[in-house]
Amino acid sequence: MAQLAGQPILILPEGTQRYVGRDAQRMNILAARIIAETVRTTLGPKGMDKMLVDSLGDIVITNDGATILDEMDIQHPAAKMMVEVAKTQDKEAGDGTTTAVVIAGELLKKAEELLDQNIHPSIIIKGYTLASQKAQEILDSIAKEVKPDDEEVLLKAAMTAITGKAAEEEREYLAKLAVEAVKLVAEEKDGKLKVDIDNIKLEKKEGGAVRDTRLIRGVVIDKEVVHPGMPKRIENAKIALINDALEVKETETDAEIRITSPEQLQAFLEQEEKMLKEMVDKIKEVGANVVFVQKGIDDLAQHYLAKYGILAVRRVKKSDMEKLAKATGAKIVTNIRDLTPEDLGEAELVEERKVAGENMIFVEGCKNPKAVTILIRGGTEHVVDEVERALEDAIKVVKDILEDGKIIAGGGASEIELSIKLDEYAKEVGGKEQLAIEAFAEALKVIPRTLAENAGLDPIETLVKVIAAHKEKGQTIGIDVYEGEPADMMERGVIEPVRVKKQAIKSASEAAIMILRIDDVIAASKLEKEKEGEKGGGSEEFSGSSDLD
């Protein structure tokens, strides 16, 4: 609101909130740091879990950063940016979501200290940009190259990703499944390995133990055989995939058929039966003994299929049809008349089995499957969900290493190395930007410090010890949280893909820079309906307080 000759001028609607300059920066930094603090205690093998209960009473128990932030109903716009950091990290690298968010929060904390010293945001932004670019170069220089057939390294990296999750007791077993699954679906393109993780299906079923989780060289479908008279088990299966219905189609035009005698009705029904029999005869003629249909199967068609000893499954999801095609080598056919023996896929066995009291179709023993399934088992829904998240992380980590062929040491070793190298680089740059680069270097120490804190160690004492050992013994020295002492992370098998770390630093610095650029927040007033819904709900406005120092 401005005032001219005593007349108030309303520029923004009534009820609009506005924060300018340092107030806006302080508020945004606080919101982002609260998010970072929320996930910080989950970091590392000794990290704690979060229990999230939604408005319907559904419970999620996890220590996966991306899942925690995705499940939380976050209102503040700056806090939402931190959620985007986690989502980007998850999409691009598959692991390191908590690391990225914690680093972003610490970068903002250090930036606030510089702002309090009257250093302009533009200078901090320039320093952070230089530091982020230099960090990418340093990570490339310290990364160790690995061959795709180095099973031991892939296994250790997968185990590192699973460590700290609920499935930790079976981490070696699950890591083996993840490595085998990724290697089966990996394809060579232009001399490089490429992995489409959509070709690895994770199917969950409660019951049994985590150890009962298994890899199927093929596809598992949560469906059952359509007719009780059909065989439940077919060996040396010849598989047809049809994305149309095995039914007589209705015409799109509003046509009417006038039947004036019982003979005409009989002829009509016989013609319908003949059409359905021709469809089934075509399937039998090409040599198929298993058929998966994306749409429905008429009762009469089911009868003929059962009569010919053909196993049929209907209403199969499009994504499952595509996986079946990749696993068995079959081609998906739209028109049944076009079906040929060349369109059929092969599998050693197609069988309907009971899993946790429900029927499922197993298509296994495929010769060179480019789609596989991991059937996840566990005692409760929460265990099964957490095993799924652990496997997702492990699969993505193995994918990163196969595609990039580069690894670095975990356990805070790479962050300490970056911190030391960036301190040296800051002196070369000089000027006020030097302060920002030094702040960036200091912020990276939050990872080893947090690992120590979450393990119940003295963070300052541990950090001093580790940095001294790191400078003396080399760049792979990090924190062994089990022993509470500095150790060679490569020797201990704590390995991460370089892509995870590069993306974490890139995402964190970009988010911090974006938040630092904001010097004005204009928030429109909420709609009346929203206000009514919030009464008594304790919903916080943008302004908030926290016990963060």
UniProtKB/Swiss-Prot annotation:
Keyword Chaperone assigned: yes
Keyword Metal-binding: no
Segments of skewed composition (Basic and acidic residues): 528-538
Region annotation (Disordered) ranges: 528-549
Biased composition (Low complexity): 540-549
UniProt superkingdom: Archaea
Record-linked Gene3D superfamilies: GroEL, GroEL-like equatorial domain, TCP-1-like chaperonin intermediate domain
PROSITE patterns: TCP1_1, TCP1_2, TCP1_3
Assigned keywords, A-Z: ATP-binding, Chaperone, Nucleotide-binding
PANTHER family: CHAPERONIN (PTHR11353)
Function recorded in the entry: Molecular chaperone; binds unfolded polypeptides in vitro, and has a weak ATPase activity.
Family: Belongs to the TCP-1 chaperonin family.
Quaternary structure and partners: Forms an oligomeric complex of eight-membered rings.
Protein's name in the database: Thermosome subunit
Organism per entry: Pyrococcus horikoshii (strain ATCC 700860 / DSM 12428 / JCM 9974 / NBRC 100139 / OT-3)
